[in-house]
Amino acid sequence: MSDVQPQKLQQSKEGMPGSAEGLHAAIEIGSTGIRLIVAEIDSKGGLKILDRASKQSRLGRDVFTMGSISRDGLRETVAILSSFSELLQGYGLQPSDIQVIGTSALREASNRDTFIDRINLQAGFHVRIVEDIEETYLMYLAVKKALEDERSFLTRSNAMILEVGGGTTEVMLLKKGQMVSSHSLSIGTLRMDEQIRESARQPPQFIEMYLESNIKTACDVLAEDLPLDSVHTFVLIGSDARFAAYCLSGKNFSHYAVLDRAQFIEFADSMANM
């Protein structure tokens, strides 16, 4: 399970270097939050994280309910990126130096081109929207990096890497470390939350039927590429994964946590029954 992101903007304890030499930064504009990471890369490709920041965002709520980003959503994003820009200036980095990517909320927003233009004009950042297949590949690279000292997790048996986002769930299937397929499923926490809100006007069993139907459809799609009963390693990424790891262990992890299968299933069942 991936490393924990802080929930508020804060300065790193590492200290602020005086120049941008060897420094890189990236920003992800996601459905539920906007995240920044600053890192130093040495001549051998080694990575040292210097700073992280994250802020909650309403973009997914806008797009998945109205189909477009609201004016308030745009203003909120500009304010967050402007605060990130101030932090980056301390590292000698300018908005034009930063890789900024947008995921499912921006992919689906009907006014995404206008949004990107406004962000560039008002905050100075150029936003690149990544398609779902690239997002899944980036997820794979992140997992490989996090598990570089424990590569057998991905090579000793068939594996599934899964990230549940606000708008989509990204899934990759690996057969002894080799990618078999990747899928972007239209199942996300914000979409499900909207269905739960609507289910207040439906019979009590509606939401359970909705989830079972969507999960069964997803499993049928995945099983065409690799029998799911042959998957023995399950890698879960994202805030829900970090929450589960914390609840089951009582502590945070710098890169990943290994959870007992039976305990995880029991925990998931308890959450479903709440």
Language-model features, listed with the residues they occupy:
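N-terminal basic/disordered segments at the start of proteins
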Residues: M16-K48
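Helical "lid/coupling" subdomains associated with nucleotide-phosphate turnover
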Residues: E21-H24, V38-E40, R58, D62-Y91, ...
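N-terminal glycine-rich anion-binding loops that anchor highly charged ligand groups
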Residues: G45-S57
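Ser/Thr-glycine-rich phosphate-binding loops at phosphate-binding pockets of nucleotides
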Residues: S31-G33, V143, G165-V171, S239
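Non-catalytic pre-domain segments flanking phosphatase-related domains
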Residues: M1-L23
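A short, small-residue-rich loop immediately preceding and capping a beta-strand
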Residues: A159-L162
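Hydrophobic residues embedded in beta-strands of well-ordered beta-sheets
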Residues: I34, L47, T169, M179-V180
